[in-house]
């Protein structure tokens, strides 16, 4: 069993965040000894899932719903699966958008490196899009995809 301070340190979270999660009902089986929260392996695993879902952009109210479904048992497996599939699709879309942004940055870094070498943008502008070097053409095309 771990104290709230130990868990906060393990996960790199403020103690206030763990208290908030507890108040939101995200640790339904959390034990208390003389008013002190005691985190076991179940809560640590729940916290790993909570942090994953938060990083995936899920709101606390939806995480709470997921945790409630977990306590309801196997009958909620289909709901949980749909929730994760929807979040996965959302993340895949976000990753694609981020990759387009990254490719634009790669292209612009290359573009300005060429402009600096030439002392002008004239030559590099004339290369776009057909005569770009292969190593940068894919980044340009992905960045400009609609």
For every predicted segment, state its role.
Residues 52-55, 68-71, 110, 114-117:
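A generic structural signal for secondary-structure junctions
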Residues 75-146:
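C-terminal regulatory/oligomerization modules of transcriptional regulators
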């Amino acid at each position: 069993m771990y104290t709230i301070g130990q868990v906060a340190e393990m996960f790199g979270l403020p103690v206030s965040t763990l208290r908030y999660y507890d108040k939101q009902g995200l640790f339904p089986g959390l034990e208390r000894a003389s008013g002190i929260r005691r985190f076991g392996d179940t809560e640590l695993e729940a916290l790993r899932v909570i942090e994953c879902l938060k990083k995936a952009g899920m709101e606390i109210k939806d995480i709470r719903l997921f945790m409630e479904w977990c306590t309801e048992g196997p009958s909620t497996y289909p709901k949980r699966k749909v929730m994760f599939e929807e979040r996965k699709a959302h993340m895949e879309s976000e990753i694609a958008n981020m990759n387009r942004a990254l490719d634009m940055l790669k292209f612009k870094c290359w573009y300005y490196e060429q402009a600096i070498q030439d002392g002008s943008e004239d030559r590099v502008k004339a290369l776009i899009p057909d005569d770009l070097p292969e190593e940068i053409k894919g980044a340009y095309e992905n960045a400009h995809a609609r």
